Amino acid sequence: MEIKEISVPQQGVVADYMNGKKEIQSCFDYMLTEDAFKQRVQDLREREFFRQDLVTHLLEYNTKLQAGEATIQNVKALGDENTYVVIAGQQAGLLTGPLYTIHKIISVLQLAKEKEESLGVKVVPVFWIAGEDHDMDEINHTFVTKNKKIKKTIFHDRNPKKASASESELSLEDCRKWIEEIFKTYPETNFTKDVLQFVDDSLRKSNTYVDFFGHLIMKMFVNSGLILVDSHHPELRKLEVPFFKQIVSKYKEVQEGLHNQQEVIKELGYKPIIETKSNVVHIFMEIDNERVLLEDNQGKFVGKDGTYSFSYEELIEEMERSPERFSNNVVTRPLMQEYVFPTLAFIGGPGELAYWSELQQVFHTIGFRMPPVVPRITITYIERDIATDLHDLQLQERDPFLNNVDKLRENWLSNQIEEPIDDRFVEAKKEIMNIHTSLQQFVKEIDPGLSAFAGKNEFKINEQIELLERMLKRNVEKKHEVELNKFRRIQFALRPLGAPQERVWNVCYYLNQFGLDFVDRVMEKPFSWNGKHHVIKL
């Protein structure tokens, strides 16, 4: 594996944050400097955490996932007041979801290791599984290449019900068949059998989406020391009750803090991402197997336009009786994370970084400071045949990231012809239409009754010219079919569906191609935190 860094243009909050623009950095409580991390440690030492209760729960949960010894030791270390965490989170995608989930975890592991060495304190890596999520459409699929097309392959559970990812039971038989269909789209390699067994071992131990995700991730990172937490685990919810109560008692201040911070963001020229009603409480409650966002209505806490209604006392009582019924929304999830874990740093993707910039005053309302927010490492893998295609087309490795691949293809094709086809046909159509306009005028003067026919004649001539243009383009493309297929392969591999590779393809493809130790070998590479994109040649 060879690793290179390239500068990929970014926009908005992320670009300005990484470029050190003071205006947007003022929306965060810490700069990404070593002094800021030292200050963060001092700030965390002044706070209290329910460490022992958390350790008890995490030991039980990670042991069930068959965690390695390094993970168990890291969980136990959390009981020490001088231990801190680097944390990130993601939904429980089937087969772990897109590659960026793996890259988030690699980011967490690397930053935790670096900060432990530089700060001289124990720093453990934590990955937060968003188990409360009810949106199965975001986690029930993966993308594959089939018949020279990119296809979204959805897992259709035979027993679907509206429940969270932590509670949605998987039909193992159906899921196994779905996985087999996925692997049929991959090339058969020396690793295929082992990877299928690897995945099936995790599936057999699982009852829910979160189980399957947790087992796969733990198995993939078994020696890394990674700690997993299911955000919707009933035992964790019990520990969170005091903070749920605090959010309910301060929901107006939370909403005001969000509104005020979004006004700051607007004044800086950015468009806020988070959209909420002015009366929202920022807490979900599970009612009749549905996740309902609570709102304030004349002092009552209501859901589904008033279908359900609770007084403050009733809501608090229900939190104490059934904490597993409650979960956070996009605004309060970061707050709950801050309440539960002594967070040295939070690692997020571009979207997360943008919406965290809207939360500074929300954190302050609760009496917290935002942790340092570190953009995750971004990675693209270039396989040997794709590197060959790039070379054959005289493209640089950075070209597909800086330019639209379709545009690169069009430019290459136009360079194979002395005169651009589009330009020549535009010119020809213009000349012919000028002649025909004059001809129509001549016809109209002699026989006005033929005017309509003359107009249709113009339309048919134009149709024939466009047909000729299409046929010529098709023949030119056929002549250069070999080279154009290289562009298609480059597009599919590096910019599938016009998106970054890590947002579409799944890690199982790479495990199948390069072996079960693929992720371990990637983790051995030195990644930098300078905002550049990492390209790994395989």
UniProtKB/Swiss-Prot annotation:
Family statement drawn from the similarity comment of this UniProt entry: Belongs to the BshC family.
Function: Involved in bacillithiol (BSH) biosynthesis. May catalyze the last step of the pathway, the addition of cysteine to glucosamine malate (GlcN-Mal) to generate BSH.
InterPro entries: Bacillithiol_biosynth_BshC (IPR011199), CC_BshC (IPR055399), Rossmann-like_BshC (IPR055398)
EC identifiers of the protein: 6.-.-.-
Coiled-coil parts of chain: 460-484
Keyword Ligase: yes
Gene Ontology molecular functions: ligase activity
Source species of the chain: Bacillus cereus (strain AH820)
Protein name: Putative cysteine ligase BshC
Entry keywords, A to Z: Coiled coil, Ligase
Keyword Ligase belongs to the record: yes
